[in-house]
Design a protein with these regions (language model features):
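N-terminal leader segment of winged-helix/HTH proteins
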Residues: 1-16, 20, 57-59, 103, ...
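Amphipathic alpha-helical dimerization/coiled-coil segments
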Residues: 2-3, 23, 84-112
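Basic, amphipathic "hinge/linker" alpha-helix immediately C-terminal to the N-terminal HTH DNA-binding motif
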Residues: 67-88, 92
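N-terminal helix-turn-helix DNA-binding core of bacterial DNA-binding proteins
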Residues: 6-46
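Canonical helix-turn-helix DNA-binding module
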Residues: 33-65, 69-70
Length: 112
């Protein structure tokens, strides 16, 4: 199979939503875990799993702070994450541009 340049970590639809949501923020801005959860529509456990994968790749950063008795987690896209998203979107544009301009697919479809 041809390497299409699509980052498999970002290509997962849920992680793409997370990264795209964070990328829409001005540089340096963060979202609270709860706000991100509401925007993406995930359970806390599911969001934690995806955030952990993105943080392991240095695509996002998270920080826990205390406000009295309440713990607040904030999440931000890192510079590395922004570059990865930019590369992913360019690879997607290239792939779709090739298809739209009459490029050929890596495989042929057989009709039965």
């Amino acid at each position: 199979m041809k390497d299409d340049g699509l980052d498999p970590l970002i290509h997962v639809p849920t992680r793409l939503k997370i990264v795209a949501t964070l990328a829409a923020l001005p540089d340096g801005d963060t979202l609270s875990f709860t706000r991100l959860q509401d925007m993406i529509g995930l359970t806390p456990g599911n969001l934690i799993i995806h955030l952990r994968r993105l943080e392991e790749a240095d695509y996002i950063s998270s920080e826990k702070t205390r406000n009295g008795t309440v713990s607040i987690t904030t999440v931000a896209l890192t510079g590395h994450g922004r570059k990865a998203l930019d590369a992913y979107t360019q690879a997607l544009r290239d792939l779709l541009g090739g298809l739209l301009s009459g490029g050929t697919a890596d495989h042929e479809h057989q009709r039965t």
